[in-house]
Amino acid sequence: MGVYLAVLFSLLVIEMAILFILVLPLPQRMRRWLYIRYSIISTNKKFRTYMVGIMIFVGLLFIDSWKRSQIRVSTYRNQKNPYIINSVTPVDALASRAYNQRNVYISGFIIYFYICILTVMSILRRIVEWNDKMKAGDDILKEKLRRKQKYLEELQKKKF
């Protein structure tokens, strides 16, 4: 139980750190570097297989914990007959419910952050591509400006 919880927490912390770095206002060079690294990693078939497997396990944990945390809890004794056995939910059942609710929260946040990372990387890809197009457009515009300046100089020479 301790190892699997440590793995879940470490996965959650890693995802939070990645998302934090991605949303920082970094310079364009750093954004491009992050996007290139993400592209390299995401095209690796082994990595994608591992990530899909991990997310399937986390999703199954989420569903299982959700179902197990939906037990009916009774904290009061039966008023009509207070001597009925098991009229109050046992402490073990309450503890199990609390553990399952904790697992729902942790696995839900892992899934949520994974979706957020994919979304932010999509936005980052668009930003990097848009800036590359702008730079390419700048070069084209500079070349057009040079040609027009040459043409203007030629016209001025012809005038005199």
Swiss-Prot record:
It comes from Saccharomyces cerevisiae (strain ATCC 204508 / S288c). The keyword Methyltransferase does not apply. The di-lysine motif confers endoplasmic reticulum localization for type I membrane proteins. The keyword Iron does not apply. Belongs to the BCAP29/BCAP31 family. The lineage of its organism: Eukaryota, Fungi, Dikarya, Ascomycota, Saccharomycotina. This is Endoplasmic reticulum transmembrane protein 2. InterPro entries: BAP29/BAP31, BAP29/BAP31_N. It is a multi-pass membrane protein. May play a role in anterograde transport of membrane proteins from the endoplasmic reticulum to the Golgi. GO terms for cellular component: endoplasmic reticulum; endoplasmic reticulum membrane. It holds the Pfam family Bap31. Keywords: Endoplasmic reticulum, ER-Golgi transport, Membrane, Protein transport, Transmembrane, Transmembrane helix, Transport. The chain crosses the membrane at residues 3-23, 46-66, 104-124. Coiled coil: none annotated. Residues 24-45, 125-160 are cytoplasmic. Its main location: endoplasmic reticulum. A motif (Di-lysine motif) lies at residues 157-160. GO terms for biological process: endoplasmic reticulum to Golgi vesicle-mediated transport; intracellular protein transport; protein localization to endoplasmic reticulum exit site.
